[in-house]
């Protein structure tokens, strides 16, 4: 089932997500729905808070970045209860987008290497180093677990310039090809 994505301004996006256990209700169905939602929305990552679930879960699929970024090929996995242990390497700029902030693309500086600890969808533990576009995608999705969104990474002046667009998104005044929940959309009577 394709899930609606919550838009900028929704309180779930600002909350720190909670860890889950293997007995989390309907986890397998949620993961399946998130994969379907990600494919439908043509994104490269989706965090549970973006589908209004304040839990520490995100999925990534780097394939849309291939062939421009060869290491994105076949990078498709789930991260549960992830803990970002270290960021290192060079700070690299990249124009990022976010399904919760449709049609906004902003340059974000991020380290090009990370070390992360997480559980896979079978709750098997992993600790890995990722770099390049893989590290970028993971950091973006991890931000959602910590209550951060794309606009939190832009310079204050740029964020001020974006305010009218962000307000419009929260009110549902944007063109988007996937279902969304708009926190400040006015209902017609």
Which ranges hold each PLM region?
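Active-site rim/adjacent substrate-binding subdomains
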Residues: 1-139, 144-189
